[in-house]
Amino acid sequence: MTEHTDFELLELATPYALNAVSDDERADIDRRVAAAPSPVAAAFNDEVRAVRETMAVVSAATTAEPPAHLRTAILDATKPEVRRQSRWRTAAFASAAAIAVGLGAFDLGVLTRPSPPPTVAEQVLTAPDVRTVSRPLGAGTATVVFSRDRNTGLLVMNNVAPPSRGTVYQMWLLGGAKGPRSAETMGTAAVTPSTTATLTDLGASTALAFTVEPGTGSPQPTGTILAELPLG
């Protein structure tokens, strides 16, 4: 199996875990996983497990089903022609849908409450200019789903090892007149097999970069850039 095919198989882990594939597609994926090299099969199974654990947490917090338009977004993203257009689009949309459910805290059983305003995740997913980009980060991946129109984005980190104790991952918005701007920090306890964060005020930034910084973070990047995701 070529490296390109391995990546194509790994990107199917999220829709597989969310049951967003047909029975025939599931059987085909099972055959491909069985025939894949051991590291690829292990990575696929780890991703499926992480997604299902995330959804289990969401289900424990609310009995509501995800909004219909998010389910549609997942199914649309899993179509073969869409997968060909963007290697990472399927996983990013499916993971972002899980974020939307978790952040939205939908309580459809309480009908007397007024409709809540759209969550950040919903605003990004429904934006006409929504885009996704993903890059390796250590042994895992970092994906950003973002909208310039909404000036915000969603970060999804899968299977990224936590930083060493006494350090943090620090995310930086690069570009623009102000130079690097800190967007978020994550310590050891904050990084799990499936980690999410909201990115606000993208402004004129052209990329999101990751470094490891001492203590609780730095005013400016001091560590080596571990990954850089273009936001153009």
From Swiss-Prot:
The chain crosses the membrane at residues 91-111. It is a single-pass membrane protein. GO terms for biological process: regulation of translation. This is Dysfunctional anti-sigma-K factor RskA. InterPro entries: Anti-sigma-K/W_factor (IPR051474), Anti_sigma_zinc_sf (IPR041916), RskA_C (IPR018764), RskA_N (IPR053877). It comes from the Bacteria. One of its GO terms (molecular function) is sigma factor antagonist activity. It holds the Pfam family RskA_C. Belongs to the anti-sigma-K factor family.
